[in-house]
Amino acid sequence: MNTVTDETHAISVNQLRAFIERIERLEEEKKTISDDIKEVYAELKGSGFDSKAVRSIIRLRKKEEHERMEEEAIIQLYKDALGMS
């Protein structure tokens, strides 16, 4: 019975190690991708584009059209309320 427990423990440890190693590999890939994105933004800025505006466009493109429209309407409402229009 003790052998079964030891084998189960060994399997659990191996599985845990595999999960951790996968996460570590993915974190490294994420860092590499993040560095690549920073390089693209640097190129973008070097070409005369406004990186802040491009980030806003990218954020908006991730949203559904109805979400964008709702956000724009709320922003316009707030701007009107503050006399900014």
Swiss-Prot record:
Organism superkingdom: Bacteria
An example molecular function term from Gene Ontology annotations: DNA binding
Short name of any one Pfam family annotated for the protein: GapR_DNA-bd
InterPro entries per UniProt: GapR-like, GapR-like_DNA-bd
Family designation: Belongs to the UPF0335 family.
HAMAP family referenced in this protein's UniProt entry, alphabetically: UPF0335
Name this polypeptide is given: UPF0335 protein BH15140
Gene source species: Bartonella henselae (strain ATCC 49882 / DSM 28221 / CCUG 30454 / Houston 1)
